[in-house]
Amino acid sequence: FCKEWVEDIQEKGLEPFKQSDINYAKAMARELRDLEDAQEILEGADGYEVSCFWVNEKYGLPCKCKLDILNTGQIGDLKKITASGGGAEWQSFCRTARNLEYYGQAAFYRDGVNAVYAHLKIPLPELQSFRWLVVEDEPPYDTAIYEILDTPRSATYQWFEAGREL
């Protein structure tokens, strides 16, 4: 029965989850929601998994992104981080952010939100922020929120230049 059910689900383009995976995700979400600042970001959001489409002004390239959280022009990005090696601790997260170029992602997403809001004639907040909501992947699922303000556009252009070289 189970194999047939899994095959049926997969044929429909769905992915079955194990109960252990569901429990794991719920435990991480519960720890994140316990942060008072996270509650403000998550509960007051305008949307989750919001898709944005725009054309980059400088290069004329069509762009898209999918925001985890959009809250009155503010962006929230969920990050699951490995607990070993420092996990959600500030210095460890900074190292991970640098190595994985999270700053470029943040700048790219900010450009997208700014372009979409401008197109829709929606005013942006005066102080624009990008927040990473970080949760470790092992119990006790330590959490943190890190914020950058007014992401420099130059980081987006660095991404485009690097992409053009490929």
Model-predicted regions and their roles:
Residues 37-42, 71-77, 114-126:
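Secondary-structure boundary elements
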Residues 65-92:
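Conserved catalytic cores of phosphodiester-cleaving nucleases, focusing on short active-site segments
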